[in-house]
């Protein structure tokens, strides 16, 4: 199941002005960016609303860029670090897989980002993805193993599959079969909140 498609052009979201609350940076691709959704429907937008409703004082900084690979993420890593995040949700890699980029390259890029965020004092939550069956079992196996391997090596929280309960469900997906619709984004946010809760003291 494909999770996202490369975008012809993508403009990074502008960081929010600091307001005293610690930052949760969502560093990802089109799933984070809310491709195809109305304003306020992306899962990072929903996450902010959820945090506010729970009285958890964090600000969510959405740095999702449609079409980004892990190499693209490295190129804008300094922008994310400038936010001095307390927590980073790292949601990259699916576009690497869809473009046939070797999993070893993806792994090295993600490792470099994790190390940079951890060195800056941020806790990392790694969002795992997967690929459509037509990419072949061996390629998919190597791709899937990257996330679990990195989570174990760097002792970071892992969401095994960010699109669990969404991907492959027509009522949760847009017509392209790649991106979550509004209902799907809500499901993704629930998974993210579940992973974040122990880190932020949320109930």
Where in this protein do the model-derived segments appear?
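Serine-esterase "nucleophile elbow" of acetyl-processing enzymes
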Residues: 5-66, 76-84
């Amino acid at each position: 199941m494909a999770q996202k498609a490369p975008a012809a052009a993508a403009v990074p979201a502008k960081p929010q002005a600091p307001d005293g609350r610690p930052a949760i940076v969502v560093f990802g691709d089109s799933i984070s960016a809310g491709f195809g959704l109305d304003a306020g429907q992306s899962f990072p937008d929903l996450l902010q609303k959820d945090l506010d409703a729970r009285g958890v004082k964090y600000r969510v900084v959405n740095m999702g860029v449609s079409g980004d690979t892990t190499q693209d993420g490295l190129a804008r890593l300094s922008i994310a670090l400038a936010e001095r995040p307390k927590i980073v949700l790292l949601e990259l890699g699916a576009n690497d897989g869809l473009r046939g980029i070797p999993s070893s390259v993806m792994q090295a890029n993600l490792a470099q980002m994790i190390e940079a965020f951890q060195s800056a004092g941020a806790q990392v939550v790694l969002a795992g993805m997967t690929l459509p069956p037509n990419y072949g079992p061996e390629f998919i196996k190597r791709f899937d193993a990257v996330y679990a391997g990195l989570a174990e090596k760097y002792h970071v929280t892992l969401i095994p599959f960010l699109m669990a309960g969404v991907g492959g469900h027509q009522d949760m997906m847009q017509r392209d079969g790649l991106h979550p619709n509004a209902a799907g984004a809500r499901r993704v946010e629930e998974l993210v909140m579940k992973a974040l809760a122990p880190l932020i003291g949320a109930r």
